Amino acid sequence: MAASGSATAGGHWFSALALGVTLLKCLLIPTYHSTDFEVHRNWLAITHSLPISQWYYEATSEWTLDYPPFFAWFEYALSHIAKYFDQEMLNIHNLNYYSSRTLLFQRFSVILTDALFVYAVHECCKCIDGKRTGKDLTEKPKFILSVLLLWNFGLLIVDHIHFQYNGFLSGLLLLSIARLFQKRHIEGALLFAVLLHLKHIYLYVAPAYGVYLLRSYCFTASKPDGSVRWSSFSVVRVTSLGLIVFLVSALSLGPFLALNQLPQVFSRLFPFKRGLCHAYWAPNFWALYNALDKVLSVIGLKLKLLDPSQIPRASMTSGLVQQFQHTVLPSVSPLATLICTLIAILPSVFCLWFKPQGPRGFLRCLVLCALSSFMFGWHVHEKAILLAILPMSLLSVEKAGDATVFLILATTGHYSLFPLLFTAPELPIKILLMLLFTVYSISSLKTLFRKEKPLFNWMETVYLLGLGPLEVCCEFLLPFTSWKLKYPFIPLLLTSVYCAVGITYAWTRLYASVLTGSLVSKTKKH
């Protein structure tokens, strides 16, 4: 009876958290939406009005279909519900079409598909180590994790204000992770394969999946020292995984292969002509690289080491542009970013293979793959930081060191999303939601690990507190100075570079913990 009552109570608090955040999402329906709103409306129109043979060729709008086929079919399914709201939104020639019914349909399509994310969070909570439990419900790791995921600030503003479907996609990722924790490897692999054909950004974490499944599922045993026992290789298991990948890929890409359109599909999915950085530099290594190039350019001009006529005008005046031309440092090619990304990922993958630490080792590798790709990838969007923040939430409630990395990563990464919402009415909303989430995250994790050393040292504390003055400077001071006209890019530049420092630090610290953890494990066994 006691166990039954406890389970019921547990179900009640989780349902209350999910219902509460759903109501908040409904309140955000009238807020600002970005051009992504028109992007997805146009995709509804394309998939509804045209035969499949024209989906990846249609270019009436500049917002062409550039997601994998499963997402196109997802839009197709939504379009058959959308027609009951407003048929005009499905007209390809109605560019930038907007109506109150279109707004309601698209907003609620995001809210309702978030049900998958809610279910995935519930499943992830079952995978949390229950050794560290508090007396009160609010001190329990499962409760804290539920809040960190369900009420994630980044998902709220990116999906339910800016407008995207990251919750639904992140739900598939988290559910796949949960299935691997539960040793339901085939289900986990299937979910991830489907996810790859919904949004190809998840290719970034595919190495973690591939190595983990091969090492921990296809090889059924290890030697006493932890190394792989080659004789334990299971042909049946590797064949089953191969069949999953093949069948899902065939279902997704098969129709376009039959139409001889695969090159066209891939050209839409991987548009390398876009340039190294997005219009607003994602806070990664290349933001620091670009900023250093600007500093060196200014110094070179002051010392008359550079010829002003030879400096690309866009790089020194308009600031944050897509096709960034370097002045002093070497320009970066897509191949260079790919090589840097692979080099950054390899150590974590090697640790996963040679010193496997179960599902948690896989999860650390996944986060490092996501972060490494964010740090060094080509044309990275700032929103891609959520790919690392959400899985890192699972680790944050189990170890103090991981909690520190999560708090620095989440606080810095979430703040870097502020430029997405640049309209005045949304300013108090984003500041309030960010403060609430950040204060809760820090206070709850500090309480959870109160018996251990402080989560932050003085340097980390000063850095995080520095986000306050940065926001005041960018939002309330610089816009009222003469710099606004002369250097309009300065607020974005400061935000990008400052946040890049924090994210780089979090990535470095997490990597150090993984590498030193492997060394400690090896020492203990010897």
From Swiss-Prot:
GO terms for cellular component: endoplasmic reticulum membrane. The keyword Endoplasmic reticulum applies. It holds the Pfam family Alg6_Alg8. Pathway: Protein modification; protein glycosylation. GO terms for molecular function: dolichyl pyrophosphate Glc1Man9GlcNAc2 alpha-1,3-glucosyltransferase activity. Its EC number is 2.4.1.265. InterPro entries: Glyco_trans_ALG6/ALG8 (IPR004856). Keywords: Endoplasmic reticulum, Glycosyltransferase, Membrane, Transferase, Transmembrane, Transmembrane helix. It is an enzyme of class 2 (transferase). It is found in: Endoplasmic reticulum membrane. It catalyses: an alpha-D-Glc-(1->3)-alpha-D-Man-(1->2)-alpha-D-Man-(1->2)-alpha-D-Man-(1->3)-[alpha-D-Man-(1->2)-alpha-D-Man-(1->3)-[alpha-D-Man-(1->2)-alpha-D-Man-(1->6)]-alpha-D-Man-(1->6)]-beta-D-Man-(1->4)-beta-D-GlcNAc-(1->4)-alpha-D-GlcNAc-diphospho-di-trans,poly-cis-dolichol + a di-trans,poly-cis-dolichyl beta-D-glucosyl phosphate = an alpha-D-Glc-(1->3)-alpha-D-Glc-(1->3)-alpha-D-Man-(1->2)-alpha-D-Man-(1->2)-alpha-D-Man-(1->3)-[alpha-D-Man-(1->2)-alpha-D-Man-(1->3)-[alpha-D-Man-(1->2)-alpha-D-Man-(1->6)]-alpha-D-Man-(1->6)]-beta-D-Man-(1->4)-beta-D-GlcNAc-(1->4)-alpha-D-GlcNAc-diphospho-di-trans,poly-cis-dolichol + a di-trans,poly-cis-dolichyl phosphate + H(+). The keyword NAD does not apply. One of its GO terms (biological process) is protein N-linked glycosylation via asparagine. Dolichyl pyrophosphate Glc1Man9GlcNAc2 alpha-1,3-glucosyltransferase that operates in the biosynthetic pathway of dolichol-linked oligosaccharides, the glycan precursors employed in protein asparagine (N)-glycosylation. The assembly of dolichol-linked oligosaccharides begins on the cytosolic side of the endoplasmic reticulum membrane and finishes in its lumen. The sequential addition of sugars to dolichol pyrophosphate produces dolichol-linked oligosaccharides containing fourteen sugars, including two GlcNAcs, nine mannoses and three glucoses. This is Dolichyl pyrophosphate Glc1Man9GlcNAc2 alpha-1,3-glucosyltransferase. It comes from Mus musculus.
